[in-house]
Amino acid sequence: MTPFIFTISATFLCLSALAAEPVRVFLFAGQSNMEGADTDPKLVETFPPFHNALRPLENVRYSYQTGADHKSKGWTNLRVVGNNFGPEITFARAFRQQSKHPLALIKDAWGGTTLVNDWAPNGGDEKSRKLYQRFITQVRDRLADLKKQGLTYKIEALMWHQGENDMFHPIGKQHYEKNLRNFIAKIREDLSTPELKIFVGEISTKGIWGMDNRANVTLIRNAQMAVVESDPKVFFVPTSHLSFKIGRP
């Protein structure tokens, strides 16, 4: 999961010239890989490429909601929260190596959630966690806070890492392409960002879920690729070639 964001950052910085916008805002959303489930900060720090990578960044604004009720109170400085962290940490450091522009990250993630229901823009059914609405509200609130501070901003991109749980949903796995298209169209509409870039992280065949469900993984991956190939503002970020976890193949 952690090396994944270096690929995203390098791809994005190659695709977009550094602009002199006062605050560059990046959005992060998805399920467990985005949330940072099963991460171990102490173990990561022992791996040479990530030495000191988890130190707080006081010059990066950060707003987050993860799981049921773990959230920041408005903007805070970017740091590891509890014992979990997602790709936002190394993304920010990779960004900082390339640019000194003001940076702000907004993240909403919850493990074990589906696009067909929990992230559905229409709210899903009565069992839905209503994460799309929660995410949009968080983004709008934080952007309003920037305005109150007299700052201008530009939403640069959304990093989306999700799909594992839709593999097990009889409707979700068959309609993932349509649901992802709808999700992207709606978020662009609701945030008034018709040209918003979307980076879609590949769901991996590694781990027990991927190894035991290769047919379903392929189904979701093909759906992701269909969206990428039809929208020049959507990019696919391969992850299956990366280590499943630090210290493991």
Could you describe each region identified by the protein language model?
Residues 1-2:
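N-terminal secretory signal peptides that target proteins for export/translocation
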Residues 5-16:
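Bacterial N-terminal signal peptides
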Residues 20-248:
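Cell-envelope and extracellular/periplasmic
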